[in-house]
Amino acid sequence: MDKLINLNTYPVSENLKALLKDKTTKKNIIFATSVYSSKGTPIKETEQMTEEILKGFTQYEIQPRVLKNKEQQQERTKAKAEVFTPSWICNKMNNHCDEEWFGRKNVFNTEQEQGWLVNTEKVGFDTEDGWKKYVDSKRLEITCGEAPYIVSRYDAATGELLEIRQRIGILDRKLRVVNENTVNETEWFKWVLRAYQSVYGYEFQGDSLLIARINLLITFVDYMQDRWGRVPTDAELRKIVNVIVWNLWQMDGISGTIPFGKPKEEYHQFSLFDFVVADEPEKQDTEEPEEVYCRIYDWRSDKSLTYKSMKEGLSLIHISEPTRRRGIS
């Protein structure tokens, strides 16, 4: 099976540095998994993911779960309850969300046994600006993994690549609506950007989060090439990547904080007073990691806020049915 993710080719290689950023800590996301601890130079769970470290990996190490060996899959399932979610299940749950939003069934496709038949007619809305409200409607995929509910470049259970017209992710549906209701590149990009600003997801494990971010980036390139027959400009890519990095973030879903507390400084300039006196016993570092609440961005209000504050009272994000199915209320 061919690689589904390649860190060394367009558009990932040109944007990898930005894709590794953590908007809360202003550093990089961390690995938050022990699966790489057996490498020549062991990688700790708290290690920041950097371009330098990733360049030392083989091309098959940062790949979706379906391409990992059985031992790795079992280890990740045991450690973090990571599982496959087939596309037909994602489609079923996303259809349920859309049925609630539209007030009718089978808006984008008709479900079949472990599959679906795409409805090719233009999606209808009750009002002239109804499509804009749909694009702006906020959705959150909790513990998103590779983000199969948001975008469906491939079936997470089989690795099969899906054609654009067969895709069933939340964002895929919004991009279809944008395609059907815009007539020029300027308007199209404006509403594609808003579609990206409307979908959110968080994940604990850094490698899965990176894959999710890459999936959203490649999805943008796919739709641009399909609609306009060109690749995005650097400026367009920067805008999309900035939204992706804000909206797909690393978090411990139970505490609402970054995994393992505040990250340690990568470098410290020593002074005379940093050296331990010969006969003085070295103090043990017994301090608990400082909790840092994760920040997200409300694009319509143009401000950042903590996920915790949003969850406790601000109705900024509609938590979709797939997230409740996965054990989160």
Predicted regions and their residues:
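Intrinsically disordered, low-complexity, charge-dense segments enriched in Lys/Arg
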Residues: 246, 260-262, 272
